[in-house]
């Protein structure tokens, strides 16, 4: 194991990195910069983190003859409001509500287009990830009592960090391909779920403005039908290490 500092869009560096790989996992976060002494999201860098990395990997594929699977951790944000469709499944057309969310769709499409019988591509649309160090109360305290632009009436769509790891292992073991929603079974919407957490922790409730609409009635049935089971289906083990 070793660390390589590089841009994902650098195909030459990517060639060296994946030359002997049989599986590649793409799990990116990026685009955060500093402007006038304050953090801000750079849309160009953000797109390069996702779409650029997908393109860099695609350009490097001739150097990786052993590669048999690509797994990409995308985001539920790709659905946007899903054009008002309810329920929402993997067959529901994506409808990103912002340019930032559009990058997930573009990266998914670029990767899916290169799938062959010998090279499988699995795209996971993950929910909001929680777990040790990212407990619900820790995430909530940053927005408690504040107005935020997101849709409180959209599904909670949360997933434990370790269930993400387990799903990736499951995808490798079963050589999954295609698109899968990856979030647990919490039935509440965002407003109700985080109101319950706020009451428990003595925090002010969030004020959801609903500027960016989210999906409702989203299903995780496809992944469960494939045989995957969640270690934390109800979101109650937020501080637990579920892999130990």
Q: What kind of region is each of these model predictions?
A:
Residues 204-244:
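C-terminal amphipathic/interface module of NAD(P)-dependent oxidoreductases
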Residues 20-71:
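NAD(P)-cofactor binding segment of oxidoreductase domains
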Residues 109-132:
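Conserved beta-loop-beta element that borders a ligand/cofactor-binding pocket
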Residues 1-22:
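Conserved Rossmann-fold cofactor-binding substructure of NAD(P)-dependent oxidoreductases
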Residues 55-99:
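Conserved Rossmann-fold NAD(P)-dependent oxidoreductase catalytic core, especially the SDR/UDP-sugar
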Residues 165-219:
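Mid/C-terminal beta-alpha module of Rossmann-like enzyme folds, strongest
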Residues 96-101, 127-128, 132, 150-161:
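Glycine-rich "substrate-gating" loop/helix at the edge of Rossmann-like oxidoreductase active sites
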Residues 138-147, 153-180:
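Alpha-helical substrate-binding/gating segment
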């Amino acid at each position: 194991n070793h660390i390589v500092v590089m841009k994902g869009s650098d195909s030459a560096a990517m060639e060296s990195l994946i030359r002997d790989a049989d599986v590649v996992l793409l799990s990116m976060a990026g685009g955060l910069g500093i402007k006038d002494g304050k953090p801000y999201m750079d849309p160009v860098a953000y797109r390069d983190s996702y779409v650029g990395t997908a393109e860099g990997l695609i350009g490097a594929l001739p150097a990786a003859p052993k590669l048999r699977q690509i797994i990409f951790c995308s985001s539920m944000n790709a659905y946007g409001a899903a054009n008002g469709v309810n329920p929402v499944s993997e067959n529901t057309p994506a409808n990103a509500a912002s340019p930032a969310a559009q990058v997930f769709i573009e990266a998914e499409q670029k990767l899916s287009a290169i799938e062959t019988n010998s090279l499988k591509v699995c795209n996971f649309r993950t929910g909001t990830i929680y777990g040790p160090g990212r407990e619900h109360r820790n995430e909530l305290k940053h927005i408690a009592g504040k107005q935020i632009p997101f849709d409180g009436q959209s599904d909670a769509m949360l997933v434990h960090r370790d269930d993400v790891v387990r799903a990736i292992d499951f995808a490798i073991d079963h050589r999954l391909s295609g698109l899968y929603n990856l979030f647990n079974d919490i039935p509440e919407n965002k407003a109700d779920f985080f109101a319950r957490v706020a009451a428990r922790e003595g925090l002010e409730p969030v004020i959801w403005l609903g500027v960016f609409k989210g999906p409702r009635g989203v299903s995780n049935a496809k992944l469960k039908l494939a045989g995957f089971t969640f270690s934390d289906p109800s979101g109650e083990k937020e501080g637990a290490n579920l892999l130990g």
